[in-house]
Amino acid sequence: GGRFDLGVGIGYRQLEFDQFGRKISHRPSLVEEGIEILRRAWSGEPVNFEGKRFSVGDLCITPTPKRAPKVLLGGMAPPAIDRAARIADGFLCTGGIGMDVYVEALKNNGKSPEEGNIILGCWAIIAEDPEAEAANVGEHVLYQSNEYIRWGAFGPPDQTPLFPDA
């Protein structure tokens, strides 16, 4: 036991929600209810849950983990970072964005900073010849960066979708 941690995020591409018939505006409650259902299922007891987004009856999973996996929650907007401090075992931090906000959110949720867990996501090249390896992966890194840019929201402030509840 203890070899698996679950990292989750609430999503941000409309396509992700369309494919499951879900509303993107329901992201916060979807992830909160989903995490609650998972935690209860890992306990080994049958789960009966009726929420705003999910309805589960007599859900059982086997084998039951010896130790429930840690749930790590990502996000960049202050509400998402607060959610990580409130309901998760750690914060998936992209490029260092939001670390200070997370520490404050822990305090605001009655937790000490020592109870927090920050997992930093960033590119790292570990190789005998980092420059040669960077040349090999550069095309792939650029592709990923361009995809994130393409998926982004662009336009004048009054016409660009915002996710204040993220």
Residue ranges and their predicted role:
Residues 1-166:
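Active-site-adjacent structural elements that line small-molecule/cofactor binding pockets in enzymes
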